[in-house]
Structures are given as structure tokens and as C-alpha cells.
């Protein structure tokens, strides 16, 4: 999935406007719960990630409303609320720098603050700053301050972590894992789009080791492709709870997409027919959507994922959520091109078991087209045991193709063409019809580019 960007939120001084703004956002699939308080104002969150987004501009032009980025960062918590710092990172840094001898050099102090990173995400025990060329500790002005030893960067980072921490334990006590002190700082640089494993090669530690140096070897591909349990255990593992579901991952080797929370909730609240039916997740990752399907009572879930570090996060998440006890989630660390063979083997090993695949998740960006033929082959494999199977197709799409309907039309045309070639070999006495059900806008990926999920109902007839 994409590198993280900060969401836009709306500071509302007139409470009578709350419903109007909420409805505008909900209509466009951009409202994010909950609404929270900031002093005497209310703050409405959104999944918009650009202040120049047309709807952000429209709402910002309403008297009594101010659009802004959430500069103080976001802390995922079990109750789903944001941890909102009353004092910004800017004020903290200004105070620190003045206390360390820069009070009289107002120009240099101002330059440092102008390039101070403000956008970050808290994933205990790590604070990840967003990638930026303008506001970054890698900016020449900050590097100059470090080189001149005007202050100790480690001291600054350490105190910054204390400032950002949601709480400090009293003597002789410990915090809940979600509320423990933060211990690591890093910069979350973009992933390489061509990398099918979606690995964050460019994550840059600032404070604290994200992985034990002793296991690092630039010439050893096994660390990425086939890590030992010792290597897996040597990494920092982050944890968040979204919609009551725990997710775990190594920030060094895998990505986490906060913006998917809205789609995860949709899975949890929209599809009652998940219960007691089967699901195939062709791009499982760390369990982004896998856990939502399991929470909804999927009978059996088949998860495919290439990245061994993602698989480890998936397995840790299964255990943390208690899903490992039932044994109904089958994880395959290999290409999803093996899915038909693996499910065929599963059927042969479980006599009397009849597949009831009701949902097939295709959650890969920028495009999941590689998995479309596989999904169709799986439907032919199961035959006519269900009258309908829903494919959840994730893609990055230009806004024009969404609004004129051409994207959805082209999806159906492509699926029909794929099915025509597959049906010649695998029809098994059934016919498939592809019907557009719903297009969900999840988040903006880039200017005019949306991450969407289109639900396609596959009608199965004999």
C-alpha cells in the first residue's frame, strides 16, 4: 500500500455546522469517526489527504470552519480515539532549542522551525515521521545544527519521545502495551513501486535500533527472503488496534497503511454473509483485511502472501486476536499463483469438505489485475455451491475514470474477457456473470488518484 500521509481535519467553532459537514463527507465516503473536542471547538476527521482537495476547499470556505492537517500526529488506540497533543511539536522544539542556547539566534532558530517535520504517526513503540524534502531532520539546516554540535541530537530525540508519549509509568508500575513509552524515532520514506513484496527499503532510524545490527548483512538476501526465527525476533514489532482488531508488523521490513481503516470497518459492518462461509485473501500482507473477515465469522480463510516478514506479522496478529486457536486460517507463504493448487490439495486432504467461497479479497496497489484470473479460477474450482461470489478489487484510479463510470465498465469488460478464455478449459458446467455492485473510495493516493475498492458480484449459474 501507499506511504503514509496526514489526513485533513476540520476545526468547527459553530456546532450547528457539524451535521452539514459530516453529511458532506459521508456522501463522498470521506468521513472518519470519531468527532472529538479541541478546547471549545469540535474537530471532524476525514480521509482527505490534500488541503487542495475540492471538498476540503469547499468545507474550508464555510464561515466558522478551518481545514488543517493533524500536526500532532495520530496514535491508534484500542478505543479508536486519537491522542491529541494540546502543545504542538513546534512549541516543544522551540522551547528545547531556546533552553540549549539558541534563544539569541532568532534567525537560525526560525530556519530550524521552518523545516521541522510536523507530520508523523505513532505506532508504539515507534514514531514514524513522514517523508518530506522541506520539513525533515535530513534538511541541510538541521544537519548543520547537528554538525555544529549546537545541541545533542540524541538528547533532543529522547526528550521529543517523552513529549510525544501518551503517558509515563509510575515507579514500580508498567503501562499497557498500547500506552507504553515510545522508544524509537524513524523517517518513513516511500517504498519502491516496482517491489512486489512492498518492502520499506528506505526507512531511516533516527533514534533507537529498529533491528539488531549483528544480523544485518547487505549481501545476505535470506534476511529478506527466508529469515530465521532469530532474525525475526531481532526486529522491533509495532502494534495497533483498529476497530477492535490487533495488527502487528515490523516497520523495517513491511508497510502499514493507516488509511485502510475505513475499508476494514466496511468489511466488518457491510457483509453479514461472511459468517459461516469461506474467504480467500490473495494479498494478505500482515492481515489488513484477513482479520476483519475472521472477526465476522468466516468459516475458513485462505491467505496468500509472499513477504516472510508480512507472514510473521500475520501469524503474530492471529495469535494476538485469538484466531490461531480455531485453526480455520490457512496461511501460505508463496505466490498466490499457487492458490488453485493449494485449495485443490486442501479438498483432497479434507474429504467431505465443500468449498463455500463467498468473498475473494484482491487488496494490492497500484493494481490487483494479476489476481483477477486466479479469482475466477477459484470460482470454477468450487463450482455451484454458492450462487454469488463477491470479488473486492482494489486499484488506484484517476478521478475522471471514477466519475464518468469508465473504470467500473472496463473492469467488467476485462473480467468477461478473462472468463471467456478460462471457461473454455474449466467451465465445469457453470456460467459466470459479472455485475458491478459498489465502488468505495478509500483514500486519495496522489493528486486526482484514488485508492478504490470495487465490489463485483459474480453470479454463478448452471
Curated annotation (Swiss-Prot):
S-adenosyl-L-methionine binds at residues 257, 264, 305-306. Keywords: Cytoplasm, S-adenosyl-L-methionine, Transferase, tRNA processing. One of its GO terms (cellular component) is cytoplasm. It catalyses: 4-demethylwyosine(37) in tRNA(Phe) + S-adenosyl-L-methionine = 4-demethyl-7-[(3S)-3-amino-3-carboxypropyl]wyosine(37) in tRNA(Phe) + S-methyl-5'-thioadenosine + H(+). Pathway: tRNA modification; wybutosine-tRNA(Phe) biosynthesis. One of its GO terms (molecular function) is S-adenosylmethionine-dependent methyltransferase activity. Disruption phenotype: tRNA(Phe) from mutant shows accumulation of 4-demethylwyosine (ImG-14) and absence of wybutosine. InterPro entries: MeTrfase_TRM5/TYW2, SAM-dependent_MTases_sf, TRM5-TYW2-like_MTfase, tRNA_wybutosine_synth_prot_2. It is found in: Cytoplasm. It comes from the Eukaryota. The keyword Transferase applies. One of its GO terms (biological process) is wybutosine biosynthetic process. Its EC number is 2.5.1.114. Pfam families: TRM5-TYW2_MTfase (PF02475). Belongs to the class I-like SAM-binding methyltransferase superfamily. TRM5/TYW2 family. Present with 656 molecules/cell in log phase SD medium. S-adenosyl-L-methionine-dependent transferase that acts as a component of the wybutosine biosynthesis pathway. Wybutosine is a hyper modified guanosine with a tricyclic base found at the 3'-position adjacent to the anticodon of eukaryotic phenylalanine tRNA. This is tRNA wybutosine-synthesizing protein 2. It comes from Saccharomyces cerevisiae (strain ATCC 204508 / S288c).
Amino acid at each position: 500500500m501507499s506511504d503514509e500521509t496526514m489526513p485533513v481535519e476540520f476545526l468547527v467553532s459553530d456546532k450547528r455546522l457539524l451535521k452539514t459537514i459530516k453529511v458532506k463527507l459521508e456522501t463522498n465516503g470521506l468521513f472518519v469517526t470519531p468527532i472529538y473536542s479541541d478546547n471549545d471547538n469540535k474537530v471532524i476527521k476525514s480521509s482527505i489527504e490534500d488541503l487542495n482537495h475540492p471538498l476540503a476547499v469547499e468545507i474550508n470556505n464555510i464561515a466558522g470552519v478551518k481545514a488543517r492537517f493533524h500536526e500532532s500526529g495520530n496514535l491508534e488506540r484500542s478505543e479508536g480515539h486519537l491522542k491529541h497533543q494540546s502543545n504542538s511539536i513546534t512549541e516543544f522544539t522551540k522551547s528545547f532549542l531556546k533552553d540549549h542556547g539558541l534563544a539569541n539566534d532568532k534567525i537560525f532558530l526560525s530556519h530550524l522551525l521552518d523545516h521541522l517535520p510536523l507530520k508523523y504517526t505513532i505506532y508504539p513503540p515507534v514514531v514514524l515521521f513522514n517523508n518530506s524534502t522541506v520539513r525533515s531532520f535530513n534538511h541541510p539546516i538541521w544537519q548543520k545544527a547537528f554538525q555544529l554540535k549546537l545541541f545533542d541530537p540524541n538528547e533532543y530525540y529522547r526528550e521529543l519521545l517523552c513529549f510525544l508519549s501518551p503517558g509515563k509509568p509510575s515507579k514500580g508500575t508498567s503501562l499497557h502495551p498500547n500506552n507504553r513509552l515510545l522508544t524509537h524515532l524513524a523517517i518513513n520514506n516511500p517504498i519502491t513501486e516496482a517491489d512486489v513484496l512492498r518492502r520499506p527499503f528506505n526507512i531511516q532510524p533516527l533514534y533507537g535500533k529498529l533491528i539488531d545490527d549483528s544480523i544485518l548483512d547487505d549481501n545476505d538476501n535470506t534476511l529478506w527472503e527466508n529469515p530465521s526465527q532469530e532474525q525475526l525476533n531481532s526486529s522491533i514489532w509495532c502494534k495497533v488496534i483498529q476497530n477492535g482488531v490487533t495488527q502487528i508488523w515490523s516497520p523495517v521490513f513491511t508497510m502499514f497503511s493507516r488509511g485502510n481503516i475505513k475499508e476494514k470497518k466496511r468489511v466488518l459492518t457491510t457483509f453479514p454473509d461472511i459468517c459461516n462461509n469461506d474467504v480467500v485473501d490473495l494479498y494478505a500482507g500482515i492481515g489488513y483485511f484477513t482479520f476483519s473477515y475472521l472477526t465476522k465469522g468466516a468459516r475458513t480463510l485462505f491467505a496468500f502472501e509472499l513477504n516472510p516478514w508480512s507472514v510473521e506479522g500475520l501469524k503474530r496478529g492471529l495469535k494476538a486476536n485469538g484466531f490461531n486457536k480455531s485453526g480455520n486460517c490457512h496461511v501460505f507463504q508463496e505466490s498466490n499463483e499457487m492458490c488453485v493448487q493449494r485449495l485443490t490439495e486442501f479438498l483432497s486432504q479434507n474429504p467431505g469438505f465443500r468449498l463455500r467461497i463467498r468473498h475473494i479479497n484482491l487488496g494490492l496497489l497500484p493494481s490487483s489485475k494479476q489476481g483477477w484470473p486466479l479469482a475466477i479460477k477459484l470460482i470454477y474450482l468450487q463450482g455451484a455451491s454458492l450462487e454469488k461470489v463477491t470479488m473486492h478489487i482494489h486499484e488506484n484510479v484517476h478521478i475522471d475514470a471514477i466519475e464518468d463510470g469508465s473504470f467500473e465498465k472496463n473492469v467488467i469488460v476485462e473480467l468477461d474477457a478473462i472468463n471467456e478464455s478460462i471457461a473454455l478449459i474449466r467451465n465445469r458446467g457453470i456460467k459466470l456473470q459479472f455485475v458491478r455492485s459498489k465502488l468505495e473510495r478509500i483514500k486519495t493516493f496522489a493528486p486526482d488518484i484514488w485508492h478504490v475498492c470495487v465490489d463485483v458480484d459474480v453470479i454463478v449459474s448452471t
